[in-house]
Amino acid sequence: MSTQSLYKVPSEIAANALVNDEQYKKMYQESIVNPEGFWREHGNRIDWIKPFTKVKKTSFDDHNLFIKWFYDGTLNASANCLDRHLENNADKLAIIWEGDDAKDQRTLTYGQLHTQVCKFANALRSQGVRRGDVVTIYMPMVPEAAVAMLACARIGAIHSVVFGGFSPDSIASRVIDGNSKVVITADEGVRAGRIIPLKANIDEALSHPDVNCVEKVIVMKRTGGDINWVEGRDIWWDSLMDTASEHCIAEEMGAEDPLFLLYTSGSTGNPKGVLHTTGGYMVYAAMTHEYVFDYKENEVYWCTADVGWITGHSYMVYGPLANGATVLIHEGVPNYPSPARLGEMVDRHKVNILYTAPTLIRALMAEGKEQFAGFDGSSLRIMGSVGEPINPEAWRWYNDVIGHEKCPIVDTWWQTETGGILISPLPGATDTKPGSATRPFFGVQPALVDNMGNIVDGASEGNLVILDSWPGQMRTVFGDHDRFVLTYFKTFRGMYFTGDGAKRDEDGYYWITGRVDDVINVSGHRLGTAEVESALVAHEFVAEAAVVGYPHDIKGQGIYAYVTLTKGSVETEELRQELRQWVRKEIGALATPDLIQWAGGLPKTRSGKIMRRFLRKIAANEVSNLGDSSTLADPAVIDTLIETRLNRSE
């Protein structure tokens, strides 16, 4: 890697950073050689009701798998985000909220947030929610979403947040899997000037014949729009809060008691409920937030992620609030009503740390830097990227136009399953290279293996695995532990398989190359190809479908569908649009195929297995070197697909 593409740590950052390069190397070495001692020390960064004495009991053996951290200690996640700050910082701003319309502004101090959470925790109890119950949250990006999460944590209920862009069918599958007794939603959401019918989506989801677990739906009034009302089931948020007590003692939870479920795409088509527990997750979310963003007291921190994704959980709610940060929450999207919105919000709220996604950076880049002519940006100190690998062009644009070449960029790699950041630069310690996630966080042991599971050393490429546990790791797939073992620990024995490929350069820096399984990454959000295929095949005119990702200028990966129609069906543009709307309704807008290519046949082996590598290459317009097609039952299919491909370069 040439020195021209190496960005040195700015001297003013290095002088005041939490750790420099020498300290990073020393701490990292200690965390690997003596994990017990390292995490014993750092486990005490949060408050424990009963202090832990046992630190780590873990095994990645697929026949005898166990993951336990701080496992004889007790604590409460809500108390760690709120109560611990009240003595000295009750009047400090916890949340600054800006609505879709910039005129809508609200703030909550730590004292006010504590009161709201205690009241809503009591409200949940009044509706029959008990410790260990699953509560589904389907909310817009409003402070009440964080209040609902923290209230669940306060009483030991398990929250399951569903992204507001998901369809009724997706909501229903998550409600059924979690066996939720209570759903929390709003009348409507507002996003980029559009009204999102949240309550109507919940009503449709709960009308699903297999949903019979939900007893109550709590509705927050966001817009005041007309909504359907089910007497005896539906209840207004405000009416519960009006009568709820402000006092609620935090439930004493075991470190390994569940904190939340979050569903992520699986390659089998059924979303999997990733289960995170309380102690290790809180330690890891708080520690990574402080070290990766070099967080300093009294800084304003803005993570643009939706609360429905793991980034919103770890780096908008639990991590920052455990550290006593002031968090900016934005209801809309940072490029509405114009691309200048992001810069306006940074300047308006004097944001010091910005954490956003490559897909947004690319969208802003496409609009041109003149959109930021009036942007000051002097408050910004650290910038982060999350959700997918950031391409070097977007990295440089982010650095130059938003960061004014003075803010270190932390390109973070992690997953829903990991609970927190695993590979990332540290602002005062790591010289950066555009497009590289660089080096592992403390306690994280990445490795590259070939397809046989042999570890490859030095500068090389392979499957990215992690060799030992870290505190933020998921513990199981809810209700399906066998699937957890099979998905993550059977492919490469004794290792956690990330599902991603990576390269390691001569400096030991990691470069994530993308998914190696059948999951695609659209705008930083993971979608299982099987899920989209299942939705397409459910249409009466579709006989077969194969879905792959392809390079997309804005979204990173777009969705490319090859569709074989039933006999007698006619390939028309109208049907193409109908199928796009069909998938949108079945799964949600995120899953809408960008391109649908009619396919008379698909490339299959003689055993009937679809050879996706050919489909990926054709979708990516890489048709000159497709590789060996001798195993195909009908190699001529390939020629036809190449001839009729849609993603041609001009």
Swiss-Prot record:
A Pfam family it matches: AMP-binding_C
Catalytic reaction(s) noted: acetate + ATP + CoA = acetyl-CoA + AMP + diphosphate
Residues the record lists as binding CoA: R191, A192, G193, R194, T311, N335, S523, R584
UniProt EC number: 6.2.1.1
SUPFAM superfamilies per UniProt: Acetyl-CoA synthetase-like
Example of a GO cellular component annotation carried by this entry: cytosol
Positions bearing N6-acetyllysine: K609
GO BP term, example: acetyl-CoA biosynthetic process from acetate
Job description of the protein: Catalyzes the conversion of acetate into acetyl-CoA (AcCoA), an essential intermediate at the junction of anabolic and catabolic pathways. AcsA undergoes a two-step reaction. In the first half reaction, AcsA combines acetate with ATP to form acetyl-adenylate (AcAMP) intermediate. In the second half reaction, it can then transfer the acetyl group from AcAMP to the sulfhydryl group of CoA, forming the product AcCoA.
PANTHER family: ACETYL-COENZYME A SYNTHETASE (PTHR24095:SF243)
Family label: Belongs to the ATP-dependent AMP-binding enzyme family.
Protein name: Acetyl-coenzyme A synthetase
